[in-house]
């Protein structure tokens, strides 16, 4: 109790604020670009590429974050990424055409990859009350997209679909001086750099991270509107879509803030397996036609898993950023694959078979993790 105030929440909140500020443009581009392609000088057929290429580049770049953070300091690296992220948002408003926007999306993908990893490293810190810190970090950072989407529709109707990104880009530049106030985080407890984590190593942890992201993130997100199409009237209103997405983000904020202390109370290692099994249960409920119940269970369990997962990953090595990079790599690959496989699975096999298969895969990966996972090293 007496040692905890020495750490405090300063770094956790500042790092989260940096991500939230530069996240504004990316959150809104998914709503605005499909509705106003001509305003950005792009064809409707290229929108999918622009909205997905950022995920590809961040997967490729995760491996560079840990060595660069050791060399230059995590705060300097975060500040540089904030510059790139803010400039990418400004580019949405000031540039046009597929080629230039493609470069801007590549910049954002690289920037997000850096800030996402350093954010979690700052939140994890020395491991004390990691659940509370990671949950708070995610809650604060997600307020950026909540505000971007909540205000975005009104701003677009007021200043137009391009100038809104200039406003958001200028706001993102505020993250740069904030990032420089963070500590360097060169090493994690010793002057000797920790052994680099093998990002692509197939082990029970990484497979479970992949499978959960595949089903609960990728497939679920890509197919939810199709699942609900017969139950909820579809609206294309810009403000309505923005507020709907903002409400989903706000729910994530609340659940992250509440879930963090729960993770500390019950310990991350004890929650990973039950949380994964609950996700499997949510998937099978959707397969059986209980879409509402399954969706609620998935959303809640996935938020808790998003807190538990990086904590478990960080405990595996003194190279915190490298370990979190491995977690993010497998999660992002699952997310990207799920977005594709979900649509194809719905088309070829229908949603009952698709979701039943995902449930079985999640249960199997959880069982493998339970039987084969090794405990974290003593220093973690």
Regions from the PLM with identified roles:
Residues 31-45, 222-240:
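Short amphipathic helix-loop junctions that connect adjacent transmembrane helices
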Residues 42-53, 132-136, 233-249, 322:
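Loop-to-transmembrane helix entry
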Residues 49-66, 243-258:
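Central cavity-lining transmembrane alpha-helices of secondary-active solute carriers
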Residues 61-73, 156, 254-267, 346:
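Helix-to-loop junctions at the C-terminal end of transmembrane segments
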Residues 76-90, 169, 270-285:
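Structural signature of the two symmetry-related core transmembrane helices
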Residues 106-141:
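Cytoplasmic helix-loop-helix junction between adjacent transmembrane helices
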Residues 114-127, 304-318:
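Intracellular juxtamembrane helix-capping segments at the cytosolic ends
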Residues 164-180, 355-370:
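Symmetry-related core transmembrane helices of the 12-TM Major Facilitator Superfamily/SLC fold
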